[in-house]
Amino acid sequence: YNIRSLYNLSDMTIEKLDGTSPRLYTLVAPLVMRRSVLRQNNNYPFWTSRSHTWFVAWEGETVFGFIPVEITDGGVAKINNYYVSGDDPHLLSRFLREIIQYYRRDYTIRSMTLIRHAEIFRSEGFVPMKEWTQYVTMEYSKNR
């Protein structure tokens, strides 16, 4: 299903939360423990730390997705293990625009992207670096 038919994306809030914020746990715990959400992430668990900032999309009582971004010692803002309800391309694009706006000035933005989302990342300015069976490493091109 497409979440656009259920909610207007412009009314949806994308909240930025510290990786160990109690509010983060309240918002994402019901999702990260759901089998269907883990399956969409190729059965890899989600994790967080003080080095992470999470972008969480919600409206009312419903959370529609999240993208954690980890800041590495090498000055990289790294996207890995994210979830977007229904693989909604419009919501994923909106997440990426928020992340790019927040990090592009000070960090190199890299993503371990699910192959099925590579085209959406490409349309937001990411270029492929290395491809595997289920993932492609991508980097945001500042020369856009």
Name each region found by the language model.
Residues 34-54:
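Active-site rim helix/loop that mediates acceptor-substrate recognition in acyltransferases
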Residues 115-133:
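Conserved active-site alpha-helix within GNAT-family acetyltransferase domains
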Residues 56, 61-70, 78:
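Conserved beta-strand in the GNAT
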Residues 2-41:
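Short amphipathic alpha-helix that is part of the acyltransferase structural core
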Residues 52, 132-137:
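Short hydrophobic/aromatic beta-strand or adjacent loop that forms the aromatic wall/cage
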Residues 75-87:
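Conserved acetyl-CoA binding element of GNAT-fold acetyltransferases
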Residues 103-115:
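Conserved GNAT acetyl-CoA-binding A-motif
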Residues 87-102:
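Conserved acetyl-CoA-binding loop-helix of GNAT-fold acetyltransferases
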